[in-house]
């Protein structure tokens, strides 16, 4: 393969497969490198490309949901993943689920038969040296140790994580502001935190439920070695009834305006976006099952009817600190010949990983062809996801799936029942204008 219009992609999961398809369809000569079957991660067992490791569900197909919007945008750009998913779908109500074996078989067959794609099965142990052609890194959440070590040398060790620790994010409009109050500890700051106060009885009942909750079991390839600075709330709880009250739920310096006194305990909520439409629960990363999170966290005063934008989780996941390292084109800022895609870039979920592969493939092709690289508008699901990667606060960055909390705030209040529809309309318009300007969907 000569360097003319050459693109190399490392990793044959959903992101790498989609990236290869997009770049090849734009006339690039693509080398897709995957270490299977020479070497397998602890979670993989099939030699096929596009292997689904956990669930076979690709979530909602509803075009007024955030992930449904992302799927619609991907289909517009002739997504391999979406096309194969649609053709291998199994009955799943309003969700899109696939026959995982047929899904991986079809992806592999489509890529192997593409005239512009060559596939190599070998392990890449180091980040490639700077080159004239673009390289997409899509090695996934279980990136092999040697490659992760090399990537850490490039990014800085403090900018590469090996576990994500995600606390729930909630819709601020669903909070009971008759109970919840704004205040920074000891008034040290402008009062950016929201506080949910508890008396002793409420706290002890909450702790009791937390201690007996149902939890997601660890996968075979995960272990329970957590960082002390980012412990699951249930692990802290197991160390004693008052441990949380002297940790994330410390009430000192946060007097309740209704009483003028410090509460017995407090749950703090930190603003997740500049508009204040979503907040995260400070220190509440958890492995509780989703139903248990909803049940137990709605016991918190002021959160009785709370609506969650994202629920908490903790699992093995290699990912970079995207806000410090990535441009909105998915290029590594200090190495513009390198693009990142998939969960390694800081997204969560099959569709989100494939979507970042789609964008990386488009931009790698544009770079190889000498064209200007593009970034989707924030009104699109693709753009909202890129915004999370590049505009979040670096200090607290954690992976996320696509959700409406990542989209721009409404200029005027929109009734809740119409929000999905309005997001879909705005996304469709933004997509049309963006594509018309840059001619992104043009295929060779």
UniProtKB/Swiss-Prot annotation:
Its main location: cytoplasm. Its EC number is 2.1.1.74. The keyword Cell inner membrane does not apply. Pfam families: GIDA (PF01134). Keywords: Cytoplasm, FAD, Flavoprotein, Methyltransferase, NAD, NADP, Transferase, tRNA processing. Coiled coil: none annotated. InterPro entries: FAD/NAD-bd_sf, MnmG-rel, MnmG_N, TrmFO. One of its GO terms (biological process) is tRNA wobble uridine modification. The keyword Methyltransferase applies. It comes from the Bacteria. FAD binds at residues 11-16. It is found in: Cytoplasm. Gene3D superfamilies: FAD/NAD(P)-binding domain. GO terms for molecular function: flavin adenine dinucleotide binding; tRNA (uracil(54)-C5)-methyltransferase activity, 5,10-methylenetetrahydrofolate-dependent. NCBIfam families: gid_trmFO, PRK05335.1. Belongs to the MnmG family. TrmFO subfamily. Catalyzes the folate-dependent formation of 5-methyl-uridine at position 54 (M-5-U54) in all tRNAs. This is Methylenetetrahydrofolate--tRNA-(uracil-5-)-methyltransferase TrmFO. It comes from Desulfotalea psychrophila (strain LSv54 / DSM 12343). The lineage of its organism: Bacteria, Pseudomonadati, Thermodesulfobacteriota, Desulfobulbia, Desulfobulbales.
